[in-house]
Regions:
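Extracytoplasmic/secreted envelope proteins and their assembly/folding machinery
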Residues: 48, 52, 79, 94-97, ...
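Conserved C-terminal helix/tail region of periplasmic/extracytoplasmic solute-binding proteins
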Residues: 319-350
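Short, solvent-exposed loop/beta-turn-alpha elements that line the ligand-binding surface or hinge
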Residues: 62, 128-134, 223-233, 305-314
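Pocket-lining segment of extracytoplasmic ligand-binding domains
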Residues: 185-283
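Secondary-structure end/capping motifs
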Residues: 247-331
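Short, glycine-/small- and polar/acidic-enriched structural segments
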Residues: 28-180, 195-203, 220-221
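C-terminal segment of classical bacterial N-terminal signal peptides
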Residues: 17-25
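Bacterial N-terminal signal peptides that target proteins for export
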Residues: 1-11
Length: 350
């Protein structure tokens, strides 16, 4: 009887432990309340890969909220929509989020999407670049008097180009900016319509130029070319931002958002999912009837995956570098501390 009693007690104790552990796990699993989050994405690029995959693979639903993807092709347009409450999460350049905060907008950075700079400068083949061998910033003198394509007027791409002109002793007035939208329409304006001479743009403009041999990238900031100060900003360049009142009043939703986005990151960083990732992006990134489009798309997506954050952590020192850069280049007119722009509950590292 004693042996039977001991066995029974051991089984009962094990059952209690298992039940308790299961209950704790369930309690710890983030769960929203069925809300819908409008999240910014960009056309014709890999854009907001976290949100696209979270939606397509059911990670949003897993944590009981819906992801609604909305196309807005610049940080400035995304921030306008965020403040106007037509979207809830932007994928934005941290510099313009800081500018919005300095101007009085009640928005905060809630995570990092792409830690490093995503911009590059490409020129059409028939545009002379005599200072190329001088490197940066000397090469910037070749853009004086030229028409420069940017995603939208007032966007992060324009602000960065202004700062690069300054490094060469030039002014914004020394070039003419033209809003050209996404990489695909930028390519048309650059290489086919010739409405612009050069463009500062995110990928895949670099890849399209390389493939068609009609234009080339002369400064690629994604691989460390350009201003040396950019190295110190790695960790906070392209960020997720939201309205402060929204994140403060919806802690469960934000926990669910983080869980869904990090699940998405784990999924698209896993090599075994690459073919499915390409399949998801094929209708999003269309190269039309361009020969070799499938190969170019695969190679580009494969090359860009490592650029995306796995944990959404914001590097605070990098964010401060961006705020200081913004002040120095008159993107903002007052000093802004990183902690003022960053939500205190956002995943972060010093």
């Amino acid at each position: 009887m004693k042996k039977q009693s001991f066995t029974f007690n051991l089984c009962a104790a094990s059952a209690i432990v298992l039940a308790t552990s299961s209950g704790q796990a369930a309690a710890q699993t983030p769960r929203a309340n069925g809300e819908t989050l409008g999240i910014q994405n960009y056309a014709s690029t890999t854009g907001n890969m976290h949100a696209i995959i979270a939606k397509e693979k059911g990670f949003c639903e897993k944590y009981n909220f819906k992801c609604e993807i909305k196309i807005l092709n610049s940080t400035s347009l995304g921030l306008q929509a965020l403040v106007g409450k037509t979207i809830d999460i932007t994928q934005s350049g941290a510099d313009l989020v800081g500018a919005a905060v300095a101007a009085g907008a009640e928005v905060v950075i809630v995570g990092t999407s792409l830690p490093a700079n995503v911009l590059s400068i490409s020129v059409r083949n028939d545009v002379p670049v005599p200072s190329r061998d001088k490197g940066y910033p000397g090469i910037m003198n070749d853009f004086k008097g030229k028409r420069i394509g940017v995603s939208a007027r007032g966007s992060s791409s324009e602000k960065h180009f202004n700062a690069m002109l300054k490094d060469a002793g030039l002014k914004p007035e020394d070039v003419t900016y033209v809003a050209v939208g996404a990489p695909s329409t930028t390519y048309t304006a650059l290489a086919i319509g010739k409405q612009i001479d050069a463009a500062i743009m995110y990928q895949p403009l670099t890849q399209i130029c390389q493939f068609n041999k009609t234009c080339e990238t002369v400064i690629d900031m994604t691989i460390g070319e350009g201003p040396k100060s950019l190295e110190a900003t790695i960790g906070a360049n392209i960020v997720f931002a939201a309205r402060k009142e929204m994140v403060e009043s919806n802690p469960k939703l934000m926990e669910a958002f983080y869980a869904a986005m990090t699940d998405a990151a784990a999924w698209f960083h896993d090599p075994k999912n690459f073919d499915e990732l390409v399949k998801i992006y094929t209708p999003i990134i269309s190269f039309g009837d361009m020969a070799g489009a499938d190969e170019m798309r695969r190679n580009w997506i494969k090359s860009v995956i490592p650029a995306y954050s796995k944990d959404l952590k914001v590097k605070v020192s990098a964010l401060q570098e961006i705020m200081d850069f913004s002040l120095e280049n008159k993107i903002i007119d007052v000093k802004v501390e990183a902690k003022r722009v960053l939500w205190d509950k956002a995943p972060q590292t010093p």
